[in-house]
Regions:
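Short, hydrophobic secondary-structure boundary micro-motifs
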Residues: 46, 56, 151-153
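Short, solvent-exposed helix-to-loop capping segments enriched in aromatics
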Residues: 37-45, 60-69
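Hydrophobic ligand-binding cavity/cleft-lining segments
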Residues: 1-52, 176-183
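Hydrophobic pocket/interface hotspot
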Residues: 34, 44, 61, 77, ...
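Terminal "cap-and-tail" regions of soluble proteins that handle hydrophobic small molecules
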Residues: 1-15, 110-113, 118-183
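Hydrophobic-ligand binding "helix-grip"
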Residues: 49-56, 64-122
Length: 183
């Protein structure tokens, strides 16, 4: 496949050597529907992975992601503001901690604008994670379209990674940021 669903994610380098990833998507669904898909564990399992989320600031967050759901992510809910904002720490095996954030806005047409970001990502992980989140948001859109996303998405991740490599000029090295940010 030589196509990509949705706009490419962007990234910005921080002074501490990490990067911030950002994606913007529009879903033709009410904000409450999108909110439930990103916050209710039984709905998260459809597109992201099996997990749990305690619906409150300070609550526990855990999800198993990746092909075969082999990667166990843990964290804490930092922001809980239904149905417009959710932020959680996202701790990888080995202790690398980032922050993911979903900001939702209802549009006048009854759709939902979703801005997703991940901050504090080590730059050496970006070439896998940037296309990875693109894939997960693509899977979220498939769920809204009534399509069951494929269980093994390794091949699709590889396709998207190549497309991101073409867009940002690399396939294996750290990409050049689209902008710089400071803390």
């Amino acid at each position: 496949m030589d196509a990509i669903e949705g706009d490419f994610g962007t990234f910005a380098a921080a002074e501490d050597g990490t990067v911030t990833l950002r994606y913007e998507r529009y879903f033709p669904r009410p904000i409450e529907t999108v909110w439930s898909a990103i916050t209710q564990p039984e709905r998260m399992a459809d597109w992201l992975g099996a997990g749990e989320l305690e619906p409150r600031a300070g609550g526990r967050f855990a999800v198993r992601v990746g092909p075969g759901r082999r990667v166990a992510i843990t964290g804490r809910v930092l922001t809980w503001d239904p149905p417009s904002a959710l932020a959680c720490t996202w701790t990888w095996p080995g202790g690398v901690e980032t922050v993911i954030r979903y900001d939702l806005t209802a549009t006048s047409a009854g759709a939902t604008r979703l801005v997703f970001s991940q901050t504090g990502l080590p730059s050496d992980q970006m070439t896998s994670v940037l296309p990875g989140w693109h894939l997960y948001l693509e899977r979220l859109g498939q769920v809204f379209d009534g399509i069951k996303p494929e269980e093994d998405f390794s091949a699709r991740h590889a396709e998207i990674r190549v497309l991101y490599g073409r867009k940002y000029g690399t396939e294996a090295a750290v990409c050049q940021p689209t902008e710089a940010v400071s803390d």
